[in-house]
Amino acid sequence: MTDTVEDVELPYDDSASQQDKLEALEEQLSTLEEENEEMRDRLLDANAENNKYQQKLERLSHENKKLKQSPLFIATVQELTDEGAVIKQHGNNQEALTEVTDELRATLEPGSRVAVNNSLSVVRQLDDEADVRARVMEVDDSPDVGYEDIGGLDDQLREVRETVELPMKDPGLFETVGINPPSGVLLHGPPGTGKTLMAKAVASQTDASFIKMAGSELVHKFIGEGAKLVRDLFQVARDHEPAVVFIDEIDAIASKRTDSKTSGDAEVQRTMMQLLSEMDGFDERGDIRIIAATNRFDMLDRAILRPGRFDRLIEVPHPNVGGREKIFRIHTRAMNVADSVDFGELAADTGDLSGADVKAICTEAGMFAIRDDRTEVRMQDFQSAREKLDQDSEPAAATDVSRTFA
């Protein structure tokens, strides 16, 4: 029921003056306008909330409708004829002749993967079968590492560039000389000497796709999984030629074969045989270069070391004094280092240390400066970092010995 004028409570007394009544009415009008504006804002918020829930309802309804649809089956096109397409279902291997729309026929070819419904009609074409794990190994953006970031490995880096980079940038040079470019390079040496760093640097200097994986990722529990992943890996490389395939810790799948009858060892050997087949099988590898790295060269099977698979066997040793000095300068070029720091003396005092150890010393020296509330790294910080690195390595060595004789 609508209030009448008599029902409305006035904001003033009847005895009030005309001026007081006018001021009271103006004050009430201002209050009502504020309340009206607030209610309008709340209405807009409510409408926005309603639209959001309406969109969510439509999305859930669409998803619910999709979930109620019958699943599609996977099949492979065996042959295209005038009557349609001959397909073979995955799983039961049953073959069938089915109709194909003109739009799909234009893109299909023998070997294409398709999705079919209950009546075996081709609904859509699927991507080529390649293991998802192999696809995620591809690195689209080249690693942000340059040759100037590597110190003490000039000879090794030159050989790697001749094997990987030169055939991609100037293939005509090899044709003129009349030789085939080396197809693979194996980097071996102690941990932390820069094997992976060299592979990243070469990839960053070429326009090739860089595909990196660890050998341990190829070791799987079920029969045939590792070999299938190797095939898929090289198929991805062929699809993205030119390509550089980097296999780290290759000793995980290429160790010396034994007479062991366990299923795990047999699966590893099957994976290695597939790798050998891909490296020098009947199918040409095309413009694909392989870089592998290991710190257990003594464990590798002789079959994988012969020429034609890895044409370059490059040892990556600990850097010498000059190499360590260059590595010190590389890792400190962005640091605020005091003028009194003698990198030549530091290099001479850090014998038999790897490039990774030198980097750890530089980082730890910076931490010592921060601990003393300084922004400048001094010679004493590097010396203290070296002592700390020696102390940290001694318990680890003792633990390894105790585990060996436990």
Swiss-Prot record:
Is Mitochondrion set as a keyword in this record?
Answer: no
- GO terms, molecular function: ATP binding; ATP hydrolysis activity; proteasome-activating activity
Q: Please list the coiled coil stretches.
A: 12-70
Keyword Chaperone present in the record's keywords: the answer is yes
- What InterPro entries is this protein classified in? 26S_Proteasome_ATPase (IPR050221), AAA+_ATPase (IPR003593), AAA_lid_3 (IPR041569), ATPase_AAA_core (IPR003959), ATPase_AAA_CS (IPR003960), NA-bd_OB-fold (IPR012340), Nucleotidase_PAN (IPR023501), P-loop_NTPase (IPR027417)
Show the segment(s) annotated as Disordered. 1-20, 385-406
Q: Name one Pfam family in it.
A: Prot_ATP_ID_OB_C
Q: Which GO terms describe its biological process?
A: proteasome-mediated ubiquitin-dependent protein catabolic process; protein unfolding
Compositional bias segments (type: Acidic residues): 1-12
Its main subcellular localisation, reduced to a broad class, is: cytoplasm
Which subcellular locations apply to this protein? Answer: Cytoplasm
What functional role does this protein have? ATPase which is responsible for recognizing, binding, unfolding and translocation of substrate proteins into the archaeal 20S proteasome core particle. Is essential for opening the gate of the 20S proteasome via an interaction with its C-terminus, thereby allowing substrate entry and access to the site of proteolysis. Thus, the C-termini of the proteasomal ATPase function like a 'key in a lock' to induce gate opening and therefore regulate proteolysis.
Q: What is known of its domains?
A: Consists of three main regions, an N-terminal coiled-coil domain that may assist in substrate recognition, an interdomain involved in PAN hexamerization, and a C-terminal ATPase domain of the AAA type.
Q: How does it assemble?
A: Homohexamer. The hexameric complex has a two-ring architecture resembling a top hat that caps the 20S proteasome core at one or both ends. Upon ATP-binding, the C-terminus of PAN interacts with the alpha-rings of the proteasome core by binding to the intersubunit pockets.
NCBIfam families according to UniProt = PRK03992.1, PrtsmActNtasePan1
Protein's recorded name? Proteasome-activating nucleotidase 1
The organism named in the record is Halobacterium salinarum (strain ATCC 700922 / JCM 11081 / NRC-1)
Q: Which gene encodes it?
A: pan1
